[in-house]
Amino acid sequence: MKKCRGRPKCPRRVEQTPDITYFKPRGVPLSGLEVVSLTIEELEALRLVDIEGLRQEDAATRVGVSRRAFWEDLKAARMKVALALSTGKAIEIKGGNYIRIETADTNEDADKMLTREKEI
């Protein structure tokens, strides 16, 4: 068994969890597929940057981690999705180290929420 080295991974703040957590190539039986696992926080990194269009710095602040930690999540997510799509593997979204938070109605509300968390 591998020993964990370095600092423990801190939980990421996640605004959305997916309703659908499994994707597979059409026409291929599930029993014959290899599966790539994508964590909830990796999916959140993809959503914030690629769908919402946030800069990585802003997305990292929203998730509550450093830019480097956010970049590692985003890089891992993109690699896993590209691997699954290019090699015909299934994608399973599960697990991770995250805290589910409510979505702020406006950016101003989000800034206030982040400020309050920093003060605590």
From Swiss-Prot:
Pfam families: DUF134. InterPro entries: UPF0251 (IPR002852), WH-like_DNA-bd_sf (IPR036388). Belongs to the UPF0251 family. HAMAP family: UPF0251. This is UPF0251 protein MM_0989. It comes from Methanosarcina mazei (strain ATCC BAA-159 / DSM 3647 / Goe1 / Go1 / JCM 11833 / OCM 88) (Methanosarcina frisia).
